A protein has these predicted regions:
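N-terminal leader/signal peptides at the extreme start of proteins
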Residues: 1-24
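…and closely analogous acidic/polar surface helices at protein-protein or active-site interfaces
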Residues: 54, 162-194, 201-203, 217-220, ...
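MIDAS-like acidic motif and immediate structural context at the N-terminus
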Residues: 40-47, 147-172, 176, 349-357
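Short, charged loop segments at secondary-structure junctions
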Residues: 72-75, 207-320, 416, 420-423, ...
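VWA/integrin I-like adhesion module and closely mimicked acidic/polar interface patches used
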Residues: 337-344, 353-416
Length: 453
């Protein structure tokens, strides 16, 4: 390109010199007319380059203006919005040669919140005025969109006995409340963000008021909670009244070893078989009841306040019930999704230790890899893989204050359908104070604004 341009300019210079020496007839006039297109082309290149620089500066100012307007757009009138847009833009756009600057901003909430800022200006020319173009018009547009993707976030929170040490439960409560505030602030309208909370230990609590529900299997509970009297032919047992149940359920599947059953690894609704139903258990370390998807932020905070550390660790049941809270079933109802929006379904699983007991394995004190296998196996089976394959993204957090080995189980569980193993979604902290930082980091990644174009 440079060689061609030099060839043209050299050729033009030689011919121009010849024209200047030639005094015959109208050669001088012809020369002047002939040079006009050349001057115009050179002038256009210079002026166009200058205008492009102004346009780039204008676009950068529009992008920043759109982002800054997004913070308060929902509370401003259209007049105030445009006044604020002009103030932001003028503070950012430092090109005094630009004239007739015009800025227009609009805010809409259909299918999510969106700010659109359009701008234009004229740039005086240096050379093109010779051929009648005294200025060039430049323009741009920037869109900041948020809320076009709605969030549904399930929090599976470890409420086991070990959370009582090192200030972990206190830190978890504080971090969870801060995360709830982040998520609340990300919602411009009700329904933009739903959150569920699943406190877990060995069991989860689905609410004792559901004792008449047809999705509960009472077989083991009736056997374990009965009053027996007499002897011989006169020996008889009477099951306790089910209204004395404390609300806890354990892993789905057969009473004995699960074998090939995978009911504990899916969110499929129960059928009429006992193995598919959720088995009641009078667990003496029953955690606070789960809270299904809601944007009742006060109710969610009340659940957090009620959490107490007690019991053994069964991460698989916390994880599968977090999933259940996103799809519904049992005591949980899920609001319909609006086709005008995209949705991101998220699970955040936080635990401070390794698995110690489920319905079939472990004693609550020692680590049980048999419990781990219900959640993840190297062959790709287990609850983690099932959840990610369904389109739900999993974040996992290991609060390791006891110097345990890093939880490869939680590390392998983190990910999404697009990236089944994603270490960027696994976090490990070695002190209770680290919980807040991780929750904040995850909350920020879920709620950040984006410039759409």
């Amino acid at each position: 390109m440079k060689t061609m341009w030099k060839h043209l300019t050299d050729s033009f210079a030689r011919k121009a010199a010849a024209f200047r020496r030639d005094r015959r007839g109208n050669v001088a006039i012809t020369f002047a007319i002939a040079t006009l297109p050349i001057v115009g082309a050179v002038g256009y290149a210079v002026d166009y380059s200058h205008a492009n620089n102004v346009k780039a500066a204008l676009q950068a100012a529009l992008d920043s203006t759109a982002l800054m307007l997004a913070r308060d757009a929902s509370s401003m009138s259209n007049t105030d919005l445009n006044a604020k847009a002009l103030n932001y833009f003028n503070a950012l756009f430092n090109r005094p040669e630009a004239k007739n600057v015009s800025i227009n901003a609009s805010y809409t909430t259909s299918g999510g919140s969106k700010i659109v800022v359009n701008g234009s200006a004229t740039v005086p020319t240096t050379f093109l005025g010779i051929i009648g173009y005294n200025d060039l018009t430049v323009g741009g547009s920037s869109t900041t969109a948020w809320g076009s993707t709605r969030l549904r976030v399930a929090l599976a929170l470890d409420n086991t006995g070990s959370m009582a040490s090192d200030g972990k439960m206190t830190a978890l409560k504080s971090a969870t409340k801060s995360l709830l505030t982040q998520l609340k602030n990300a919602a411009s309208t009700n329904g933009d963000v739903y959150v569920s909370i699943v406190p877990f230990a060995k069991d989860v609590n689905v609410g004792s008021s559901n004792y008449n529900a047809n999705w509960i299997d009472w077989t083991d509970w009736d056997n374990d909670n009965q009053y027996c009297s007499g002897w011989g032919w006169y020996y008889s047992c009477t099951p306790a009244n089910r209204n004395t149940w404390n609300g806890c359920i354990t892993d789905r599947g057969p009473s004995g070893a699960p074998g090939t059953s995978t009911w504990d690894q899916v969110a499929t609704l129960p059928n009429n078989t006992a193995i598919s139903k959720w088995p009641a258990e009078q667990y003496n370390a029953c955690p606070v009841a789960i809270k299904g998807l809601t944007y009742d932020w006060s109710a969610l905070n009340n659940v957090v306040d009620s959490m107490q550390p007690n019991g053994a660790t069964n991460q698989p049941i916390g994880l599968v019930w977090a999933w259940q809270s996103l799809v519904g079933g049992g005591p949980l109802t899920v609001p319909a999704k609006d086709s005008n929006y995209e949705y991101s379904d998220i699970i955040i699983l936080m635990s401070d230790g390794l698995n110690t007991q489920d319905r079939w394995y472990g004693n609550g004190s020692n680590t049980s890899t048999a419990v781990d296998y219900r959640m993840y196996q190297t062959n790709g089976s287990g609850t983690c893989a099932n959840i990610k394959a369904s389109g739900v993204t999993i974040y996992t957090i290991h609060v390791n204050t006891d110097g345990d080995p890093t939880s490869t189980l939680l590390q392998n569980c983190a990910g999404s359908k697009d990236k089944m193993y994603d270490v960027s979604k696994f976090f490990t902290v070695t002190s209770a104070s680290g919980i807040a930082k991780v929750f904040n980091e995850i909350g920020t990644s879920l709620t950040q604004l984006r410039v759409a174009k």
